[in-house]
Each structure stands twice: as C-alpha cells, then as structure tokens.
C-alpha cells in the first residue's frame, strides 16, 4: 500500500459508519498498514471540531495521536498552497474551501495519494499534480 492522506470527508463518513470505497480503504489502512496512513494538521482540526460529544472528541484525539503526521515547513507550505489557489483561480476553477488547497499541497509536496469525498479535490487534481484515489 502506498502512503495516503485521508481527507476529513472520509473520516467523517467513516465515523458515521457510511460504507463507500473511500471508507473501506480507510478501514483497510487502519487494519493492515497504519505506517502508510498519514494525517495533516488541517484534517485533525476539521474532524475534531465537528465532533459532538466530549467522549467522541477524546476517543478520536487519543487515536489520532498514534498516527503519522507530516512534519511541515509551515511558511513554505502556506505560500505554495496560496499559489495553488491563485493558479486555480486564474484557470477559473473555484475552490470552496481554501483549506482544501493546503491539504492538497501537502499531498503534492509529499507525492502522496489523497483519498477524499469532496469535489474540491477533483477540481484541484484536474488542474495540478495532485493524485487522488478514484
């Protein structure tokens, strides 16, 4: 299995018990190949912010603390993700959430597969070097 980032959208579906090719792949990574599963700070933040109970928050917080996270040069990734957003805007590609450009840029910089359930990433992949799971 190759190294992969699972976007917040997949973690949300997974936590709700939704069965899809993305959540099935996440479960496979969790069961068979945790070393290849990476998180980004944005995914952790977005997911934890959306939880409804303290118990769920603490459960996922403890779980996320055991997973890999990319070490980042925040200045460089911030500038390059802004450039990605800017370049997409010039191509008249509208990205609803600028944080998706940050997640995408981290995946691009690390040549990592991005697994998602968010149309923003499809638009980014069609207009950049982003590799997405289909």
What are these regions (language model features)?
Residues 7-8, 47, 81, 107:
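Generic structural signal for small/hydrophobic residues in well-ordered secondary structure
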Residues 1-39, 49-62:
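Short, well-structured N-terminal submotif of metal-dependent ribonuclease cores
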Residues 1-3, 104, 108-134:
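Acidic, PIN/NYN-like endoribonuclease modules and their adjacent C-terminal/linker elements
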Residues 8, 41, 97-101:
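Conserved glycosyltransferase catalytic-site signature
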Residues 70-113:
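Active-site neighborhoods of divalent-metal-dependent phosphate/nucleic-acid chemistry enzymes
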Residues 55, 61-70, 74:
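Active-site-proximal, substrate-binding regions of enzyme catalytic domains
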């Amino acid at each position: 299995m190759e190294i992969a980032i699972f976007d917040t959208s997949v973690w949300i579906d997974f936590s709700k018990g939704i069965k899809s090719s993305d959540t099935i792949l996440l479960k496979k990574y969790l069961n068979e190949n945790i070393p290849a599963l990476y998180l980004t700070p944005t995914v952790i933040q977005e997911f934890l912010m959306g939880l409804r109970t303290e118990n769920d928050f603490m459960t996922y917080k403890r779980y996320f603390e055991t997973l890999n996270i990319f070490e980042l040069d925040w200045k460089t990734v911030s500038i390059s993700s802004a450039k990605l957003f800017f370049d997409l805007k010039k191509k008249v590609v509208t990205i609803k959430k600028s944080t998706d450009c940050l997640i995408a840029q981290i995946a691009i910089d690390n040549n990592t597969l991005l697994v998602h359930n968010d149309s923003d990433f499809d638009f980014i992949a069609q207009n950049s070097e982003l590799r997405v799971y289909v």
